[in-house]
Amino acid sequence: MSANSLTSKLTWSRRFKDAAFRTSLTFSILAALGLILYIFYSLWRDSSFLLSSDLLTKFPSNDPDEVGFQSAIFGSLWVVGVAALVALPIGILTALYLEEFAGKRNRLTSAIETNIQNLAGVPAVVFGIIGLAFIARGPLSWGFTVGSAALVLAMMILPVVIIVAREAIRSVPPSYKDGALALGATPWQATYRVVLPNALPGIATGSILAVSRAMGESAPLLLLGALSFVTFNPTGLDSQYTIMPLTIFKYASDSREEFHYIAAAGSLILVAILFTLNLLAILLRDYTNRKNRV
């Protein structure tokens, strides 16, 4: 076999593998996109005739002509907002400590890292059981309130925030911090002024995605007494509440067909909220990238 023939066969083999890989990637992307578009279409088909401002301004009702999702929207925003206020600062500071100040790997940092990785894979319902035993009842006894639900969701998304923040901090070239230290900055100044701003796009994107996950959770909150029918908005951490997934489930399981269409409309509203959060993550990442380049 000549050298030219062997080279030709190797080139053809590489091209075939490259084409097969590109085709499989394209098919996977199109399949995922097609599934998402089909879900959107199904929700729109079943609920487009119901979409109006009344769904946002009215409270849940047993009358399909007077139904709305205001208390569910406000309840979700309260619970997820407070959870984010608790989890994001703690998660980012923990990531900074582990990556920038913990020093060489030791038993303490190894134990912390292992537990963080394990907690990230714990099912949501387990956090609900822990919250029921120690927060809603038990030592804290906060009851079935917004505060209990927010603290449980904060526990649930905290490992994700820490992992994402650590990856973002690792992506910053070490030379950036070394340059700041060489100019006389303290380790904290170099971290705060150089490392953190450059890691912020990744931290912000991952944090918002973690918050988006919390917005769609219902299993842990079922154990914490989240109601499915609430005709008032929460006013504080000690208020009772409902959330969008539970209200949607209530309408979807109703025997009357009208409420099935209302559930589809609620699902579309929830998807719109999640889409807005993801869009915010993209815009925030692009903004911080442009700001860092300037």
Each PLM stretch: what is its role?
Residues 1-29, 281-294:
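Transmembrane alpha-helical segments of polytopic membrane transport and secretion proteins
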Residues 4-23, 43-83, 105-106, 250-261:
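Periplasmic/extracellular loop-to-transmembrane helix junction in inner-membrane transport proteins
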Residues 61-63, 67, 221-271:
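Interhelical loop and adjacent transmembrane-helix boundary motif
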Residues 83-116, 129-132, 137, 282-290:
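Transmembrane-helix boundary motif in ABC transporter permease subunits
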Residues 84, 164, 187-225:
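Transmembrane alpha-helices
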Residues 98, 166, 170, 174, ...:
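C-terminal transmembrane helix and the adjacent membrane-cytosol boundary/short C-terminal tail
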Residues 117-157:
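Generic hydrophobic transmembrane alpha-helix motif, especially the helices
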Residues 123, 183-184, 197:
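Glycine/proline-centered hinge or cleavage motifs at structural transition points of membrane proteins
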